[in-house]
């Protein structure tokens, strides 16, 4: 068996094409969606990530609002910038790029973001709405990576209603919120959340119809632990030593040989990552649509 690749790049391109049309419709009404980013310090990885966000914005017609602060910025200075973005009608969604410098209370910073402008979909208020609304339509920003995982599966007709889904990793960006989305009346999946305290992880994996690997442990999921035909999505990222070069390189949680037994595989890179970026833009556009009374 050779697994079907869940192509996140192609799916993200389709999402962006749809967003481009929706942004054009908003512009005809005099509404221009805007993404704000708050970057503190000069970390090259963070700066590159933020630049990528704004390139994505340019593709679909979203305005860019960039706030850059030195690594010496105080808690109060960062909070002041957040307050300005909250009040700025040109900004329909924004993110605070993590990590923040040592000494900054990141949780306090993130909690001050207006929930309606929470482009990451991870504000406590928005996660609370996911807990409370099992059947009702969600009218607030959704967590980007979990939403991207589900979108990618549905686009490839992977059945989720009643499916056994095993999520490995309990981080706030993927592991914890994805269960809230998957156990809603739709998609209606059954979710097991595994982590470092899980006994006999392999037995959980072997029963799964869908595996979402988000632990940050290189090669954690191998073909011996995957049920034939299962869908396996690699969302984990860690650094390992490349024996060929002696340098570190990025690695996912899923071993390459999983493709020999799985029915579907979302590789890393190229799988869920592009969808995460595209759905961040979706949150920004949907916020603008709600503000314009279109949702």
From Swiss-Prot:
Assigned EC number: 1.5.1.5, 3.5.4.9
InterPro entries attached to this UniProt entry: Aminoacid_DH-like_N_sf, NAD(P)-bd_dom_sf, THF_DH/CycHdrlase, THF_DH/CycHdrlase_cat_dom, THF_DH/CycHdrlase_NAD-bd_dom
GO molecular function, one term: methylenetetrahydrofolate dehydrogenase (NADP+) activity
Catalytic activity: (6R)-5,10-methylene-5,6,7,8-tetrahydrofolate + NADP(+) = (6R)-5,10-methenyltetrahydrofolate + NADPH; (6R)-5,10-methenyltetrahydrofolate + H2O = (6R)-10-formyltetrahydrofolate + H(+)
Biological processes annotated in GO: L-histidine biosynthetic process; methionine biosynthetic process; purine nucleotide biosynthetic process; tetrahydrofolate interconversion
Binding site for NADP(+): 169-171, 196, 237
Record-linked SUPFAM superfamilies: Aminoacid dehydrogenase-like, N-terminal domain, NAD(P)-binding Rossmann-fold domains
Keywords of the record: Amino-acid biosynthesis, Histidine biosynthesis, Hydrolase, Methionine biosynthesis, Multifunctional enzyme, NADP, One-carbon metabolism, Oxidoreductase, Purine biosynthesis
Pathway: One-carbon metabolism; tetrahydrofolate interconversion
Pfam families recorded: THF_DHG_CYH (PF00763), THF_DHG_CYH_C (PF02882)
CDD domains linked to this entry: NAD_bind_m-THF_DH_Cyclohyd
GO cellular component labels: cytosol
Subunit details: Homodimer.
Function: Catalyzes the oxidation of 5,10-methylenetetrahydrofolate to 5,10-methenyltetrahydrofolate and then the hydrolysis of 5,10-methenyltetrahydrofolate to 10-formyltetrahydrofolate.
NCBIfam families found in the cross-reference section: PRK14193.1
Family: Belongs to the tetrahydrofolate dehydrogenase/cyclohydrolase family.
Protein name, UniProt field: Bifunctional protein FolD
Annotated organism of origin: Kineococcus radiotolerans (strain ATCC BAA-149 / DSM 14245 / SRS30216)
Gene name, Swiss-Prot/TrEMBL: folD
């Amino acid at each position: 068996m050779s697994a079907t690749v869940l192509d996140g790049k192609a799916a993200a391109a389709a999402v962006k094409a749809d967003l481009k049309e929706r942004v054009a419709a908003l512009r005809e009404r005099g509404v221009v969606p805007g993404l704000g980013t708050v970057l503190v310090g000069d970390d090259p990885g963070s700066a590159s990530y933020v630049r990528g966000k704004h390139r994505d914005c340019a593709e679909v017609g979203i305005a860019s609002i960039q706030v850059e602060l030195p690594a010496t910025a105080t808690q109060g200075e960062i909070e002041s910038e957040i307050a300005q973005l909250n009040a700025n009608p040109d900004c329909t969604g924004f993110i605070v790029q993590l990590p923040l410098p040592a000494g900054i209370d990141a949780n306090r910073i993130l909690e001050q973001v207006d929930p309606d402008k929470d482009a990451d979909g991870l504000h406590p208020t928005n996660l609370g709405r996911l807990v409370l609304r099992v059947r009702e339509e969600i009218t607030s920003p959704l967590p980007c990576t979990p939403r991207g995982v589900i979108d990618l599966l549905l686009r490839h007709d992977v059945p989720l209603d009643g499916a056994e889904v095993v999520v490995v990793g309990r981080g706030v960006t993927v592991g914890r919120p994805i269960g809230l989305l998957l156990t809603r009346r739709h998609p209606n999946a059954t979710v097991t959340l595994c982590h470092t305290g899980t006994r006999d992880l392999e037995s959980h994996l072997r029963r799964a119809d869908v595996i979402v690997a988000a632990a940050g442990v290189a090669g954690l999921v191998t073909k011996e632990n995957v049920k034939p035909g299962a869908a396996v999505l690699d969302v984990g990222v860690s650094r390992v030593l490349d024996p060929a070069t002696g340098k570190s390189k990025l690695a996912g949680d899923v071993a390459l040989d999983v493709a020999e037994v799985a029915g579907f595989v979302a590789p890393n890179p190229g799988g869920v990552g592009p969808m995460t970026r595209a759905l961040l833009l979706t949150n920004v556009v949907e916020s603008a649509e709600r503000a314009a009374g279109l949702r």
